């Protein structure tokens, strides 16, 4: 009887400790470079090292080649307001559905069933290539700011941190590409809970004897480093520390 009682007490104590352990949620979303990042190889090992005994969990909603309008139903109205013509709007939108916003809410709800209270929520965003190539950059700043605001509202986390992966240097010959990089930095700098990740060193590779800056990052090391940087910048925001200003923590 004493053995059973002792075992019960130990199990109860373990459950209490587990319940008291802070849980930090990261939302990983975006297009191909976020899709290509396996959180198990770079992000989670780094997060576990940083947070120690605290628990880190994540949800991931990402798919290659997707413009921001796949996350935001208000994008069409924003695009018109910013002067995009109907032809360009149709070319970017392609009558596609807003298919990636609700899955974030659904996965968040599922996570809440396992962890009723998150110590922090951090939104990691790696997207923008499709909008830059399609000429959608005039609407991008307002669209991304609204997406962030909606997530903070719908997740009931006005304290949600954001970490934006700035577009790489792959397409800098295009004016729209450079404009997109600038927009992403403006959003980070204007948000008191914002940080950014630099990826300009993750896509350099040799082709036909020349070094090129590719759209997609080097495998596996580029995506491992990407995950580590997201974890480090998120950790700094969560702990009230100053994120790396150069985006390369």
What residues fall within each predicted segment?
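Positively charged n-region of N-terminal signal peptides that target proteins for export
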Residues: 1-4
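Hydrophobic h-region of N-terminal signal peptides that target proteins for export
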Residues: 9-18
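Cell-envelope and extracellular/periplasmic
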Residues: 19-249
């Amino acid at each position: 009887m004493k053995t059973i009682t002792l075992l019960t007490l130990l199990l109860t104590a373990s459950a209490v400790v587990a319940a008291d352990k802070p849980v930090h949620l990261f939302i990983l979303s975006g297009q191909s470079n976020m899709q290509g990042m396996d959180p198990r190889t770079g992000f989670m090992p780094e997060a576990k090292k940083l947070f120690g005994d605290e628990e880190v969990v994540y949800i991931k909603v990402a798919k290659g080649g997707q413009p921001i309008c796949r996350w935001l139903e208000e994008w069409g109205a924003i695009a018109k307001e910013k002067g995009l013509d109907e032809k360009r709007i149709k070319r970017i939108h392609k009558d596609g559905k807003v298919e990636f916003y609700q899955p974030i809410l659904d996965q968040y709800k599922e996570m809440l069933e396992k962890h009723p209270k998150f110590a922090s929520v951090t939104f990691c965003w790696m997207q923008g290539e499709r909008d830059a190539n399609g000429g959608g950059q005039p609407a991008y700043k307002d669209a991304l700011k609204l997406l962030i605001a909606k997530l903070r509202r719908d997740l009931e986390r006005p304290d949600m941190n954001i970490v934006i992966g700035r577009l790489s240097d792959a397409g800098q010959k295009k004016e729209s590409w450079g404009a997109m990089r600038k927009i992403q930095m403006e959003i980070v700098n204007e948000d008191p809970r914002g940080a950014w990740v630099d990826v300009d060193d993750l896509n350099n590779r040799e082709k036909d004897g020349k070094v090129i800056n590719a759209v997609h990052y080097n495998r596996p090391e580029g995506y491992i480093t990407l995950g580590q940087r997201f974890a480090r910048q998120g950790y700094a925001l969560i702990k009230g520390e100053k994120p790396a200003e150069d985006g390369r923590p």
